[in-house]
C-alpha cells in the first residue's frame, strides 16, 4: 500500500492512502480492496476503476477513525470492522462465480470466528451487508481461515482443514 499523501498526475495511480491491501478483487470495472488496519480497524474499500488519484486516508484515517488532519479528497471506506481476538476479517472476492442473492453480485468476506458476510451495491449506490452463511462448525476453535473461488464455486477453509463449498444454489 501507499501510505504517503502526495498528489499524482499519473492515470495508472488509482488509489493512495492504504496501509496493507492484501486481497484485491476486480468486478465490472470496479475494485474491492481488503486493507488491514494498523491496530484498530480493518477496511473493505470499493473503488471505481474510472477514478484515479483517490486518497483513502492512511495514515490519517483508519476505518472511520481520524488520526490526523482531514483533507477534502479523503474517502471513508465502505465497510470496516474493529479488530478483536479471532475476529479479524478474512477478505474476500467477487465476480466470476459470485454468490448471488436477489440478482446482486456480492463481495464475500468472513471473520475468523466463522461468520460469513456479503456486501452488495444497489443501483442507487447504497452498500448493504447481509449474513449469507452461518454454520456452527466455524466456532472459534475451528476458525475460518480463507475464502477462495474456483470455476466450480466458492470454498471456505477452516483451521482444522475442513473445506466447505458455498454457492448460490441454497
Model regions and ranges:
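Beta-propeller domain segments
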Residues: 1-131, 142, 149
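Blade-level signature of beta-propeller repeat domains, shared across WD40, Kelch, NHL, RCC1
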Residues: 146-170
Amino acid at each position: 500500500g501507499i501510505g504517503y499523501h502526495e498528489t499524482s498526475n499519473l492515470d495508472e495511480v488509482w488509489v493512495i492512502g492504504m496501509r496493507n491491501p492484501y486481497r484485491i478483487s476486480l468486478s465490472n470495472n470496479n475494485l474491492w480492496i481488503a486493507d488491514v488496519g494498523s491496530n484498530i480497524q480493518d477496511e473493505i474499500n470499493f473503488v471505481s476503476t474510472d477514478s484515479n488519484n483517490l486518497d483513502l486516508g492512511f495514515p490519517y484515517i483508519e476505518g472511520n477513525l481520524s488520526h490526523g488532519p482531514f483533507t477534502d479528497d479523503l474517502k471513508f471506506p465502505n465497510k470496516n470492522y474493529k479488530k478483536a481476538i479471532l475476529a479479524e476479517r478474512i477478505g474476500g472476492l467477487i465476480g466470476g462465480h459470485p454468490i448471488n442473492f436477489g440478482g446482486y453480485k456480492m463481495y464475500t468476506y468472513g471473520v475468523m470466528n466463522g461468520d460469513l458476510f456479503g456486501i452488495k451495491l444497489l443501483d442507487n449506490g447504497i452498500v448493504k451487508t447481509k449474513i449469507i452463511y452461518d454454520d456452527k462448525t466455524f466456532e472459534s476453535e475451528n476458525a475460518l481461515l480463507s475464502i477462495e473461488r474456483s470455476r466450480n464455486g466458492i470454498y471456505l477453509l477452516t483451521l482444522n482443514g475442513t473445506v466447505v463449498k458455498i454457492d448460490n444454489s441454497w
